Design a protein with these regions (language model features):
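Intrinsically disordered, low-complexity regions enriched in polar/acidic and amide residues
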Residues: 9-11, 46
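Conserved PLP-enzyme active-site core in the AAT-like
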Residues: 28-329, 333-339, 343-348, 352, ...
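N-terminal intrinsically disordered, low-complexity tails enriched in polar/charged
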Residues: 3-7, 25-34
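A cross-taxon signal for low-complexity, glycine/charged-rich
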Residues: 1-5, 12-13, 18, 23
Length: 363
């Protein structure tokens, strides 16, 4: 049996180009474009966290947590039930558990975060629901792609039956669904009797691009549950699960507790969400991130793999070209062979963005 040290070495030696950051020269400052998860916490969020010290009610009984429903109902223009959670995976999986029974299935894109990057958590939290994988350019689903999956599933007791659809907006490749595109899927979901979930880890970036109301691209388009992301956009550790059918939240409150996600000092999570909502800070930070991505996209030219509609830029780059960028101090992830991913954030330094744009143009 391998020793812990041997196991650790094996893990470190495994080929993990998707997540490993090759070291840049030690004498150069790192300019990070690998993930908006690494972005700084916005000062106004920090202030809100500190202000929450003055409250002492535990779990979700404090006035900040209790105000979330009202604040988000006002934002979306309809009655909602909102639950804070400490991660996007938690938000996604609790939403899916509310929409899909253990014996059911969820249609999602082959490259969806719930399929590739949540470590089996969707299956765990739903107690065994199956993920049905669909195709689509830029990780976007269409009604036709979803129907192709649904039509291939016979109404047979021996086969898992679909119960929900999950899309990501903005997608894992930085593409944005318009309200009309979401509504087309929403119509399909209603017609088929399926729940409809939106993974909104970068929901703010999508809304900033669209210039529409949050309502237009969610409940007005048929979405039942939204994982409203804040961590990538200026928060520290708070995401918000928004149910447009408040009845869905009733049992989810118990699932959140059972899953160990009901933090005793939850007021600090609520404080972050509320700070992001104040004066539309969530949109201001998303617009800043999107604008910086647009600068990189302009430099990318023919190297662009996907249209840049949010804050992610995917470029064609040979290993030598990627190494040349890293030698100049830029940090980013390798993606597929011959591809790199650059992610901007609300706090991306404009000088760094300009330098990277120049370096890309010079390749």
């Amino acid at each position: 049996m391998a020793s812990p040290k041997e196991i650790l070495k094996q893990v470190q030696d495994d080929d993990m180009p998707h997540w490993r950051l090759p070291a840049h020269p030690a004498n150069r400052r790192s300019m990070r474009f690998f993930s908006d998860n690494a972005a700084a916490v916005h000062p106004r969020v920090m202030q809100a966290i500190q202000a929450a010290d003055r409250l002492d009610t535990a779990y979700d009984g404090d006035r900040l947590s209790r105000s979330l429903d009202g604040r988000l109902s006002a934002l979306f223009g309809t009655e909602v039930a909102a639950l804070w959670v400490p991660s996007g995976t938690a938000a996604n999986c609790l939403a899916l558990a509310a929409l899909c029974p253990p014996h059911g299935g969820i249609v999602c894109h082959r490259d969806a975060h719930i399929q590739n990057d949540e470590g089996g958590a969707p299956e765990f939290y739903t107690h065994g629901a199956k993920l049905f994988l669909a195709e689509g350019e830029g990780a976007k689903l269409t009604p036709a792609a979803i129907e192709a999956v649904l039509d291939a599933i016979p109404d047979d007791v021996h086969r898992v039956q679909p119960h929900a659809i999950s899309i990501t907006n903005a997608t894992e490749y930085g593409r944005v669904y318009t309200p009309a595109e979401v509504a087309a899927i929403g119509d399909l979901a209603r017609g088929r009797g399926l729940g409809f979930h939106m993974d909104g880890a970068r929901f703010a970036n999508a809304v900033a691009t669209l210039g529409c109301t949050p309502a237009a691209v969610t409940w007005q388009a048929g979405v039942d549950a939204l994982s409203f992301g804040f961590v990538k956009n200026g928060a520290m550790s708070a995401e918000c699960l928004v149910f447009f059918d408040p009845d869905l939240a009733a049992v989810t409150r118990y699932r959140r507790k059972r899953a160990g996600l009901l933090l005793s000092k939850g007021r600090y999570l609520a404080a972050q969400v509320l700070a992001m909502l104040d004066d539309d800070l969530w949109l201001d930070t998303a617009r800043a991130a999107n604008a910086r991505a647009a600068t990189l996209a302009a430099a990318g030219g023919d190297r662009l793999i996907h249209p840049v509609e949010a804050n992610e830029v995917f470029l064609r780059a040979t290993p030598d070209e990627a190494a040349a960028l890293r030698a100049k101090g830029f940090d980013f992830y390798d993606w597929a062979p011959g591809e790199i991913r650059l992610v901007t954030a609300w706090d991306s330094d404009e000088g760094d963005v300009g330098a990277l744009a120049d370096a890309i143009a010079a390749l």
